[in-house]
Amino acid sequence: MIKLSNITKVFQQGARTIQALNNVSLHVPAGQIYGVIGASGAGKSTLIRCVNLLERPTEGSVQVGGQELTTLSESELTKARRQIGMIFQHFNLLSSRTVFGNVALPLELDNTPKEEIKRRVTELLDLVGLGDKHDSYPANLSGGQKQRVAIARALASNPKVLLCDEATSALDPATTRSILELLKDINRRLGLTILLITHEMDVVKRICDCVAVISNGELIEQDTVSEVFSHPKTPLAQKFIQSTLHLDIPEDYQARLKASPETDSVPMLRMEFTGQSVDAPLLSETARRFNVNNNIISAQMDYAGGVKFGIMLTEMHGTQEETQAAIAWLQDHHVKVEVLGYV
């Protein structure tokens, strides 16, 4: 549905040249929810704005629904953009218009008959859970409700693609979850292709089928969500995954933690489990094989793309030789083990 090929975008600021995107290629199949994640300044917003040519690429090809957009005339591009809805971090609602009026605006600009506008807007407000807010004004809505209005407006022209530019960044966690569930529901009901950009791996984890990691204007990793979470190939992807699972060392352990082993001290380990290592009884196996005892201090488990992954803090009791052998065995079985210190 969306195919970006060898996209390069260069900005000129006086005598300074800024390369925002460098030879980026991305394919989003029809009906998928595809996430692009990266830090601030990585090129995410420039990338998504190239899809509907709000930013015209310096080089490269942009195809949406099989149509090459970069060669279209202005009138042809305007028509093509009706098939591409877009929502933003800031809702951009017209304060002087009601909820109904905001959603109706693109239809009015397209000279849609009034009866058709009424039917379509009513249908969309019901879809986004605002069927009772027809006559409300944006000032009387919560942030989540405003974003729902923006989503309804973006869907007014019955697009095949929805672009989401940091659509949940300005929302609290509970509202973020509700908006993500709404997007997932719309994707299922309408078969809508969704491309979203974010700096939060939690967003990707909750609703995306595939994810690409962008850094310094380049896509450095892209795959299914389950594959990236199970086998991240780049340090940046690993960092984003770690941000979704975070365990603090308890204060009493922190006070006793030493950088080097002492008499009768034991290593404190941080273990990351992904893919098959989550379900395997690996700690029990280390106890049998290496005569070590694992005291679990804290643990957290989650799902992404249908795959479980988790993190654990443990004390490993045993001789130095036994614990080193056990740690090496765990690493051989795809557990990432970090020695945090000794307690």
UniProtKB/Swiss-Prot annotation:
Its main location: membrane. PROSITE patterns: ABC_TRANSPORTER_1, ABC_TRANSPORTER_2, METN. Transmembrane segments: none annotated. Its EC number is 7.4.2.11. It is found in: Cell inner membrane. InterPro entries: AAA+_ATPase (IPR003593), ABC_MetN_proteobac (IPR012692), ABC_transporter-like_ATP-bd (IPR003439), ABC_transporter-like_CS (IPR017871), ACT-like_dom_sf (IPR045865), MetN_ABC (IPR041701), MetN_ABC_transporter-like (IPR050086), NIL_domain (IPR018449). Keywords: Amino-acid transport, ATP-binding, Cell inner membrane, Cell membrane, Membrane, Nucleotide-binding, Translocase, Transport. Residues 2-241 form the ABC transporter domain. It holds the Pfam family NIL. It catalyses: L-methionine(out) + ATP + H2O = L-methionine(in) + ADP + phosphate + H(+); D-methionine(out) + ATP + H2O = D-methionine(in) + ADP + phosphate + H(+). Gene3D superfamilies: 3.30.70.260, P-loop containing nucleotide triphosphate hydrolases (3.40.50.300). ATP binds at residues 38-45. It is a peripheral membrane protein. One of its GO terms (cellular component) is Gram-negative-bacterium-type cell wall. Belongs to the ABC transporter superfamily. Methionine importer (TC 3.A.1.24) family. Part of the ABC transporter complex MetNIQ involved in methionine import. Responsible for energy coupling to the transport system. NCBIfam families: ABC_MetN. The complex is composed of two ATP-binding proteins (MetN), two transmembrane proteins (MetI) and a solute-binding protein (MetQ). This is Methionine import ATP-binding protein MetN 1. It comes from Salmonella choleraesuis (strain SC-B67). The lineage of its organism: Bacteria, Pseudomonadati, Pseudomonadota, Gammaproteobacteria, Enterobacterales. The gene is metN1.
